[in-house]
């Protein structure tokens, strides 16, 4: 199934190229296995990344790179077209949910500290028994931390895409041409721009 317009194809190509390139450059993100601009459900395209080896735990550094990768499409759209579409809406949701879990469930916020403010189901742990004003203060701090984490992810993605603009263009143009890049084809493109694919001994120890 081909996208409806040339503009849609170009926009989706840069969006997915943004995801893929950020994942390939940042050290704690999983390697890219496939990139496509063929529509899949409600998404205009998709980027598939898989860990090299199965792991049961994930580190804060890996979560931070995952958020940057999630925002790579948003950043690419803004950088290339000076605007954003509805395309990154699911990416924003993924990044926000992950950032919030880092803060409230896994104690990964330096500001909030190593406390669990939500259960595994996402329910607040400080509940009705806690003073309302105190509860609102915590909620505000959580929101501020979530925003900061996402903003940091955006800045990280921006740095990658600005420093590797030629690679971004090359990935997007190749996607416009062939629509889908499998792992080997994708890696040939990035290698041409000095970006080395991730190998097993380079991968980090912890991952969910």
What do these predicted regions represent?
Residues 1-3:
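Interdomain coupling/hinge region of P-loop NTPase helicase/AAA+ cores
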Residues 8-14, 20-208:
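Soluble catalytic regions of large protease machineries
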């Amino acid at each position: 199934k081909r996208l409806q317009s040339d503009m849609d194809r170009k926009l989706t190509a840069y969006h997915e190229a943004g995801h893929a390139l950020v994942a390939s450059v940042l050290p704690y993100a999983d390697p890219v296995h496939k990139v496509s601009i063929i529509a899949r459900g409600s998404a205009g395209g998709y980027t598939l990344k898989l860990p090299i080896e199965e792991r049961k735990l994930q580190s804060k550094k890996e979560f931070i790179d995952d958020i940057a990768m999630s925002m790579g499409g948003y950043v690419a759209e803004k950088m290339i077209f000076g605007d954003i579409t509805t395309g990154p809406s699911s990416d924003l949701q993924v990044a926000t949910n992950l950032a919030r879990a880092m803060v409230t469930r896994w104690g990964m916020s330096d500001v909030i500290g190593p406390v669990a403010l939500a259960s595994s189901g996402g329910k607040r742990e400080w509940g009705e028994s806690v003073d309302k004003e105190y509860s609102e203060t915590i909620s505000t701090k959580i929101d501020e931390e979530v925003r900061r984490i996402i903003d940091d992810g955006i800045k990280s993605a921006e740095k990658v895409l600005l420093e590797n603009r030629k690679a971004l263009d090359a990935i997007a143009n190749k996607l416009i041409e062939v629509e889908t890049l499998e792992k080997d084809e994708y890696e040939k493109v990035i290698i041409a721009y000095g970006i080395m694919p991730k190998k097993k001994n380079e991968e980090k120890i912890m991952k969910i």
